Amino acid sequence: MESLTLQPIARVDGTINLPGSKSVSNRALLLAALANGTTVLTNLLDSDDVRHMLNALKALGVQFMLSDDRTRCEVVGNGGALKSATELELFLGNAGTAMRPLAAALCLGSNDIVLTGEPRMKERPIGHLVDALRQGGAQIDYLEQKNYPPVRLRGGFTGGNVEVDGSVSSQFLTALLMTAPLAPQDTVISIKGDLVSKPYIDITLHLMKTFGVEVENQAYQRFVVRGAQQYQSPGNYLVEGDASSASYFLAAGAIKGGTVKVTGIGRNSVQGDIRFADVLEKMGAVVTWGDDFISCTQGELNAVDMDMNHIPDAAMTIATAALFAKGTTTLRNIYNWRVKETDRLFAMATELRKVGAQVEEGEDYIRVTPPAKLQVAEIGTYNDHRMAMCFSLVALSDTPVTILDPKCTAKTFPDYFEQLARISTLA
């Protein structure tokens, strides 16, 4: 297996221009495809997940022009639901941000479309979304295991009253919200259980509004969406930098700055993961906010005990930053780590122990106590981009670290290690 050894880093200092947000990129692409008019998306993320969405849209007959560097995309809107005249199978890799929204959007009208993906995608639950779509009239079959992809979609979603479980993934609600305006009837979505990752719903509602559709949000418990609407292209849309990707660089600044500045996000960002910077500040780092940047300067870091439900992806970065904090750090309410690219709670606990940390892994929490000195280790990445990026922070010590399968960062940040090297001074 390919590996990359990072030598100890004495200091980090500099500016990182962030790649586009994965969450925003794939939502914007789908809405642009469903809308009336042509949309020009800039700062689009070039990554595996976005390529899977683009490939699916192309197979569905959507016309778009992509720049050579794949960060500018001109999408000719379809002016309504996406249809396939023939049977179609779409392979979506391990892209949850493509699988969930497409599973809903392709239930409009009548289709015969199979959505499938990598083996890990077939382990990521989709049952709650399918149940909700069926309540709205959709005809959906599981082709292998019940409640998991691959699924066959035969259309039929007309709206009405639907109930969706919000406790596993906010992407199920996102998928329903983006599809509902194009259904013939009004849709009332009621949430069962606690809604996880609320800020991701805010991204969805913001994008829908950008494309001309308002949703009545009743305290995140009920959402009322008028049917028989159409999305309207905003013309041009700038995709924000990826706030989850920012977390590694901001944490590096907190641990071994200098000052690290990330651009492309700022105090008014639509992404909830910018709140990660508040956690670093609470730990003792110095954080500065601008309209289009966040910067972080080294401070003496102390452990925190916090509920991380609102920033599940960026919270992983705190688990490795905890190796540099005084005391025991506890991250709570993170059950949904278990249904991401890999079981991230298990993976994180396993790999933190390799570098010498004392770790307690609960059903929905993790507790990390750093060792006196980090140990040299080979870090397994579980084909999970965030594991690879999180554990790069171990090199901000006097211990080198080896990352196995470093190219898995291609899911959201293909040149991550080059960017980290650019702001690093080796010990």
Curated annotation (Swiss-Prot):
Domain of life, source organism: Bacteria
GO molecular function annotation: 3-phosphoshikimate 1-carboxyvinyltransferase activity
InterPro entries xref list: Enolpyruvate_Tfrase_dom (IPR001986), Enolpyruvate_Tfrase_sf (IPR036968), EPSP_synthase (IPR006264), EPSP_synthase_CS (IPR023193), RNA3'P_cycl/enolpyr_Trfase_a/b (IPR013792)
Catalytic activity: 3-phosphoshikimate + phosphoenolpyruvate = 5-O-(1-carboxyvinyl)-3-phosphoshikimate + phosphate
Gene Ontology cellular-component annotations: cytoplasm
Residues the record lists as binding phosphoenolpyruvate: K22, G96, R124, Q171, R344, R386, K411
Pfam families per the UniProt record, alphabetical: EPSP_synthase (PF00275)
Chain coiled-coil ranges: none
Record keywords: Amino-acid biosynthesis, Aromatic amino acid biosynthesis, Cytoplasm, Transferase
Active-site residues, record numbering mapped to chain: D313 (proton acceptor)
Subcellular location: Cytoplasm
GO biological process: amino acid biosynthetic process; aromatic amino acid family biosynthetic process; chorismate biosynthetic process
UniProt similarity note: Belongs to the EPSP synthase family.
Free-text function comment from the UniProt entry: Catalyzes the transfer of the enolpyruvyl moiety of phosphoenolpyruvate (PEP) to the 5-hydroxyl of shikimate-3-phosphate (S3P) to produce enolpyruvyl shikimate-3-phosphate and inorganic phosphate.
Assembly information from the UniProt record: Monomer.
Protein name in the entry: 3-phosphoshikimate 1-carboxyvinyltransferase
Organism: Enterobacter sp. (strain 638)
